[in-house]
Structures are given as structure tokens and as C-alpha cells.
Regions:
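Membrane-embedded transmembrane helical bundles of large multi-pass transporters/channels
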Residues: 1-35, 41, 136-381
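Generic intrinsically disordered, low-complexity segments enriched for polar/acidic and small residues
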Residues: 27, 39, 57, 111-115, ...
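Surface-exposed, low-hydrophobicity interaction/linker segments
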Residues: 35-38, 102-104
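Structured non-transmembrane domains adjacent to transmembrane bundles in polytopic membrane proteins
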Residues: 45-162, 378, 384-476
């Protein structure tokens, strides 16, 4: 290991030059790596949800959908709004009140139940559905969501997963650099105070930052990464690999005490000692991240590969780039040395060792409450609830819930296209009786037998009924 250290010491300037040059392709790779904002994409392909999405695309030419709430607009203007939305690229179809019965049919002659699906007479809100020709998080769908907002001059509220994904993308792109910067500043402040040099944290951040950029840039070869991975990777890599840099610095100081007149020899020894200690530690860390790769929910694979790669690059940077920085700016580091503020923990350490049985008893006693807490902690699965209320999608979900019978989310059921009207109504009635369901409807149940299906436009029927399947909607 010491031989490797001597090579690094000898080639420190070329290493620094190369490390800066590698930032160029890494930055290009980072900006050209596609980010996936659809959590559903990472579900196994054989589950019903993903099979249903494939059927929607193959049989109906639809992937994503959104519910649009229009507040305080008369029917004529809503119809004009729908026409605008239909003209947006990648909007496959729009299902609205006017599209079903036309503008000339008085709403008073229609069943109250049917009208309630599209109108709230008390608040003046109107509801219609948009279907897109691509999947929930595709670039085309997100672009279409934004264009719908633009053509309607923000007069409508777009709810649904595609709107959530679009707003999540905007928010993540805006906030990720900010909290990474906050993490770096906080780490620098803590290290500058508790270490013996004000300058060394800067070189820690430079070497770790380069490794992070290499990691994020090399994601280009993975094709795409999830927005969760992109948001977490930098901060996680910083936290996981920072200890390696601290270990190298302390090892270098100890080696300098033995060879005070030869700092290059001291660094070679420090690199060797760091490699010996850090490799074992990093392997266990890498193994932990690789374990995520075996999840059937493949977000684990996405995060595991990126973080395992980040740890390896962090170790390499710690024993190549960081030593090169330290030796190159050794005199500047010496000038910024100060007395360590961190107190000596020798006495507490000896006391803990001498009274270890006390801590054993304490932790055994804490095990029971810990297990109870783990088993009784409530887990939420709705990511949209974690988003700020000021986002467009959050406001839209609230409008949807306030105006249409507590509706929060709308889902689709794909049923047999040849299902009779009687069986369809019976199925929807059973679904409506389930806890947490606001409403469930199919074409037959929406009409309620009072309006013949034949009265509906063929274009509408074909949107909801195919050769093998028909679309039913369920709201929770």
C-alpha cells in the first residue's frame, strides 16, 4: 500500500490536472442524463398496475391522465377551454360534459347523479378528464401538462399523478442545488471549528465534490436515474465518504510526527494506512447499497448502483485527489492551523469501558420499546401529501376534493368490454360500498339506465370501450 502512496505523491500534479479535466465529461454527462420522475416506473412489470398501463397504451392509445377542475366558468367558455386543451400536442382525448351530451342539451333533463360527476352547482366548479398518449412521467406528458396550463392561462386546476410529477420535477430542479450547498456549508463550518485547520475542510469538499460530480456524470451510462436518486446521491455520498478524508488527514498528521522533515514520505505512509483501513469499511458500505439492488421495487436498484459507485469513487478520490491537494497546498495549510476545540475523550472512554455492563443493560431494556415503536409507526405511501401546498398540483387536488365529494385521487379499472349493463352497475355498486371510495362509475352506471348508451357519441364510446376492455373510474 505504501508503494501506491509513493506513486500518488510523485504524480500529485498530473493527478490534479487529470482530476480537473475529468470534470468536463462528467458535467456533460450529468446534464445529459435523463431523470425519471415516475415512481410507478420502478414497480415490477408483472403486477396489475403495470399490466393495466400497458393495456391502456396498446388498446386505447392512452397512458397518463389528469382531472381538470375549472372554477366559476360558464358552460360555453368551458367548451371553448376544452377545445384549446384538445389542440395541445400529446393530448389523446378529453372527456367533458359537453363532449358527452353537447352544449345544446339542457342539464336539467339529465339525471342528478350524472351531472354531479361533472358539475358542482353550489360552487360553480366543472370537471373534465384529459388523456395523454404517453406514460405518466414521459417528457412529452410533462410538456403537455405545462402547455395545458399555458393555453388555459392558469384558469384551471390540473390534478393527478402527471401533474404531481411535473411539479415535482420543477421543484426538485430548483431546490436540489440549494440543499446540497447548505450541506456543504454546514460541513465546512463544523470541520473548520472542530479540526485543527481552517483550510483543510475546503480541500475535503473539493476532493469529495469532484468524486460526486464523477458519480453523477457517469450516471449517463445508466440511461436514466430516478429523481429521488438524483436528489439524494450528492448529500448521501458526502455523508458516507467524509470519514475517509478525516481518517487520511489524521493519519497524515501522525506520520508527520515520525518524519517531520519529509512530508511526502508522511503522506505516502498516510495513504497506505488509509487504504488498509478504509477499503474494508467501504466494502461493507458498498455491500449495503448493493443489497438494495435485489429489491423487486427497482428504485432500490437505481439508488443502490449509483451509491455503490459513489462510494468507490469517493475512496479513490480520498487516496489520490485529496493527498495531491494537501501536499500541493501544504504551506497554506500550515499557516491556517489552530488549536483543536474538540475536548479529550480519554476519561469518558475509560469510564464506559469499565462500566460496559451498565450500557448493555440499558440497551437490552430499550430493545422492547424500540421494537414496539417500529411495529406501530404509521407509514404513508402518498407522496403527493408531502408536497408544499403552494404547488399547482396540491392546489388542484384540494379543489378536486372540495368540489367533488371528497375526491383526492382517481384511478382506472379495466374490465371486460362485453360486460352487460346490469353486471357493470352491480360491480360499480360493490366498489362504491368499499371504505375509502368516493365514487365508482362506468359508462353504464353513469347513465343509470335513464339514458341509452346509443345516445352517446360513437367517438366517446370508443374512448372508453375497446374490443377487449372498457375503462371504469374509481375515486378515493
Amino acid at each position: 500500500m505504501k508503494k501506491f502512496g509513493k506513486v500518488v505523491v510523485k504524480l500529485r500534479i498530473p493527478i490534479l490536472v487529470l482530476s480537473f479535466l475529468l470534470l468536463i465529461p462528467s458535467v456533460l454527462g450529468y446534464f445529459n442524463t435523463r431523470v425519471n420522475y415516475d415512481i410507478l416506473y420502478y414497480l415490477p412489470s408483472d403486477i396489475d398496475t403495470m399490466q393495466g398501463q400497458d393495456i391502456l397504451l396498446d388498446d386505447f392509445g392512452k397512458g397518463a391522465y389528469a382531472m381538470v377542475v375549472v372554477d366559476g366558468m360558464n358552460k360555453s367558455n368551458v367548451s371553448k377551454l376544452v377545445k384549446k386543451v384538445e389542440g395541445v400536442d400529446h393530448v389523446a382525448s378529453v372527456i367533458s360534459y359537453s363532449g358527452i351530451v353537447g352544449d345544446d342539451v339542457p342539464s336539467e333533463i339529465l339525471p342528478d347523479k350524472f351531472r354531479s360527476y361533472f358539475e358542482n352547482e353550489d360552487s360553480g366548479a366543472t370537471l373534465f378528464a384529459i388523456f395523454f398518449d404517453d406514460t405518466t412521467s414521459s417528457d412529452d406528458t410533462m410538456k403537455a401538462i405545462q402547455e395545458v396550463r399555458d393555453v388555459t392561462d392558469n384558469q384551471c386546476y390540473i390534478a393527478g399523478m402527471s401533474a404531481v410529477v411535473t411539479d415535482t420535477k420543477t421543484m426538485a430542479e430548483k431546490e436540489t442545488p440549494f440543499y446540497v450547498l447548505v450541506a456543504v456549508v454546514l460541513v465546512c463550518i463544523v470541520l473548520a471549528i472542530f479540526m485543527d485547520s481552517f483550510l483543510v475542510p475546503v480541500f475535503f469538499m473539493l476532493s469529495i465534490g469532484m468524486a460526486i460530480v464523477y458519480n453523477l456524470g457517469s450516471n449517463y451510462f445508466l440511461g436514466e436515474v430516478s429523481y429521488i436518486t438524483k436528489a439524494l446521491a450528492a448529500v448521501l455520498q458526502l455523508g458516507v465518504t467524509l470519514d475517509y478524508s478525516i481518517f487520511l488527514w489524521h493519519s497524515y498528521k501522525e506520520a508527520k510526527e515520525e518524519t517531520p522533515d519529509d512530508h511526502q514520505e508522511a503522506m505516502a505512509v498516510a495513504i497506505g494506512n488509509t487504504l488498509t483501513s478504509v477499503v474494508g469499511s467501504s466494502i461493507t458500505t458498498v455491500a449495503g447499497f448493493i443489497a438494495l439492488c435485489f429489491m423487486s421495487f427497482t428504485l432500490g436498484l437505481d439508488l443502490g448502483v449509483v451509491m455503490a459507485k459513489g462510494v468507490v469513487l469517493g475512496v479513490i478520490g480520498c487516496v489520490t485527489i485529496l493527498p495531491s491537494f494537501i501536499l500541493t497546498f501544504d504551506k497554506a495549510l500550515e499557516k491556517t492551523m489552530h488549536r483543536e476545540i474538540m475536548p479529550n475523550f480519554d476519561k469518558p472512554a475509560r469510564w464506559i469501558v469499565n462500566h460496559s455492563w451498565i450500557f448493555l443493560i440499558i440497551f437490552v431494556l430499550l430493545l422492547g420499546p424500540a421494537i414496539y415503536g417500529y411495529n406501530n409507526t404509521k407509514v404513508y405511501y402518498d407522496l403527493s401529501d408531502t408536497l408544499p401546498e403552494k404547488l399547482n398540483c396540491s392546489q388542484a387536488n384540494k379543489m378536486l376534493a372540495d368540489n367533488f365529494d371528497g375526491t383526492n385521487s382517481i384511478y382506472m379499472i379495466l374490465a371486460d368490454s362485453n360486460l352487460s349493463a346490469e353486471d357493470s352497475n352491480a360491480m360499480m355498486n360493490e366498489v362504491n360500498d368499499l371504505d375509502g371510495i368516493s365514487f365508482a362509475l362506468s359508462i353504464d352506471s353513469a347513465l343509470g339506465g335513464e339514458i341509452p348508451t346509443e345516445m352517446l357519441p360513437d367517438s366517446l364510446v370508443s374512448e372508453l370501450k375497446g374490443d377487449e376492455y372498457q375503462i371504469m373510474m374509481v375515486s378515493t
